[in-house]
Amino acid sequence: MKTLIHTLFTILISMPLIAQDTEIQPYEVIKKHDSVEIRYYPSATLVKTSGGNNFGKLFQYISGNNENSEKIAMTAPVYMNEDKSEMAFVMPLEVHQKGAPEPKGKNVAVEVTKPRYVAAIRYGGYTNATKETAHKKQLLETLSTNGIEPLGEVEYLGYDSPYKFYNRRNEVMVEVRYDSEK
């Protein structure tokens, strides 16, 4: 029994270290307004889809359903639009630098983004519509208060596997017109 408890304790302590191996899309925090971060994101490669079974289609792509039959590491975050009809995976930096293979699956596309400024607000736990709405409202109110103009629609970002139970990271984000004087 003592060995079982020790083994379980070791596994639980190690889980955050294992989770840290996931590559996170790089960004630089430029400024903070309360709980809202203004960030600079360099160019990145996304693989996007829409129209149902979005996660499955993107997972098939990184599992080898692409022109090179190349397996690609899962990264974070996963991007979703407000009604969850569109989803995108960020490609690892190495794939971005060499170029992502073309998808074989229908309704899956590779997109290279331009560098951009965004405003983001982070929250924990499992996400749901109530949390998303509250954080979207807080994000947009903070931007308005600080005279920062949002560009386009908000995006919802998930960083964790559904099997991660604690220290979960979610964000609501929107591209902004950024002026360093504000």
Kindly give the residue locations of the regions a language model identified:
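A solvent-exposed interaction/effector surface
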Residues: 2-5, 15-182
